Amino acid sequence: MSGFSTEERAAPFSLEYRVFLKNEKGQYISPFHDIPIYADKDVFHMVVEVPRWSNAKMEIATKDPLNPIKQDVKKGKLRYVANLFPYKGYIWNYGAIPQTWEDPGHNDKHTGCCGDNDPIDVCEIGSKVCARGEIIGVKVLGILAMIDEGETDWKVIAINVDDPDAANYNDINDVKRLKPGYLEATVDWFRRYKVPDGKPENEFAFNAEFKDKDFAIDIIKSTHDHWKALVTKKTNGKGISCMNTTLSESPFKCDPDAARAIVDALPPPCESACTVPTDVDKWFHHQKN
């Protein structure tokens, strides 16, 4: 969407790498807290964390000031998702809806599990491969209820409103009709993507059935309410940084100079990326259960 831009710090695929978001005035903002949930009527903003076909597990750093995008780290090593045959990296543009939060203190009535302490995830199914940190408007189509190591981890299915075919997609059944096999592949991907790392398969509520647009929007609105409680200090943040530059009702609001100081303290941008390990291109063959 127009008005937002990104600024990288340090080298991509390094432990220090960060992507910060800026508004139309060039001021640093939090992609978690300062970008409005809605881009337009019935259109949600999406923060793209991982472009389709890529492997680096980038995510909004919920516990860092200003919540830049960074690569996830496990046991001191940068995380890359495996290529689980027949897939290459992520099979959609993957990211999050801003101003949402899956509250780890809230037991979801649909799943019986508490939230995963992150913004709600989005799988964008359009034709364009988006850029890391890009802010797009999406039309919500449905939702999948994944259970990840005992936590609720909703996956919203959506399409970029600027996609040439966006007008043809209005609910989850349109995805089934126009992209046969895509939803089945989505379940398969989420079920098995951690197996190459030695983890068990993920589970799903509703027997891995996708719920429709109206159900999805209700879930998103619920996570938005949880986020409101978070940034107004009405609930325990569980270590999350709520620093923001736009929310007048939030005690965590800071001025632009304080936000700039956060960024200026980090390594400068680097023109060249670090080398990605060659085994990231490996294909994993795993028997489906």
Swiss-Prot record:
Binding positions for Mg(2+) 2 per the UniProt entry: D121
InterPro entries: Pyrophosphatase, Pyrophosphatase_sf
Residues recorded with modification Phosphoserine: S250
Keywords: Acetylation, Cytoplasm, Hydrolase, Magnesium, Metal-binding, Phosphoprotein
GO biological process: phosphate-containing compound metabolic process
Any coiled-coil regions, as ranges: none
Positions that bind Mg(2+) 1: D116, D121, D153
Signal sequence bounds: none
Entry's transmembrane regions: none
Residues bearing the modification N-acetylserine: S2
Record-annotated disulphide pairs: none
Catalytic activity annotation: diphosphate + H2O = 2 phosphate + H(+)
Coarse class of the protein's main subcellular location: cytoplasm
Sites of N6-acetyllysine modification: K57, K228
Any one Gene Ontology molecular-function term assigned to this protein's record: inorganic diphosphate phosphatase activity
Cofactor: Mg(2+)
EC number: 3.6.1.1
Pfam families: Pyrophosphatase
Classification via PANTHER family: INORGANIC PYROPHOSPHATASE (PTHR10286)
Family from the record: Belongs to the PPase family.
Protein name as catalogued: Inorganic pyrophosphatase
Species of provenance: Homo sapiens
Taxonomic path: Eukaryota, Metazoa, Chordata, Craniata, Vertebrata
